[in-house]
């Protein structure tokens, strides 16, 4: 019996790029789910629940594989205090998010799920990031240049312009990009 196939059920090019660093062959799969946060649950519970919903959606779309397919999904949000920052709806929301995140620390939460038949691994990884102050013009330039509308918190830590404003990071860099690679690899070993 060969090794199971790995499917990254995500439309994120950043997650695809991160997972490719492992040199493990995988396929990607686009799925559509509602990413609804439950205000009565913790941030960790929310991102893990959304990642699980994505995995279950992907599993429902795949033919039965007799335990030969591992599905990987993830969900990322940014939070400062009790405020959660998802993906911005447009320029104004992106501007407001970056304005409020600058010059103070915030946390990036990524929940990920590995699913294969009846075996499920769920985990949430948290990284603290602190941004330098940014002028209104610097924020505008960043948004117009990088168009961060598909990124939680309105920024990509990997974006060249953002490198100028990262004061401190505590935890996993790849988590901030969208997939905590070291934790995913550790969990993946139990499936292979």
Swiss-Prot record:
Keywords: Cytoplasm, Hydrolase, Nucleotide metabolism. GO terms for cellular component: cytoplasm. It comes from the Bacteria. InterPro entries: ITPase-like_fam, Maf-like. The record marks 14, 76, 158 as: Important for substrate specificity. It catalyses: dTTP + H2O = dTMP + diphosphate + H(+); UTP + H2O = UMP + diphosphate + H(+). It is found in: Cytoplasm. One of its GO terms (biological process) is nucleotide metabolic process. The keyword Cytoplasm applies. The keyword ATP-binding does not apply. Its cofactor is a divalent metal cation. GO terms for molecular function: dTTP diphosphatase activity; UTP diphosphatase activity. It holds the Pfam family Maf. Nucleoside triphosphate pyrophosphatase that hydrolyzes dTTP and UTP. May have a dual role in cell division arrest and in preventing the incorporation of modified nucleotides into cellular nucleic acids. Belongs to the Maf family. YhdE subfamily. This is dTTP/UTP pyrophosphatase. The lineage of its organism: Bacteria, Pseudomonadati, Chlorobiota, Chlorobiia, Chlorobiales.
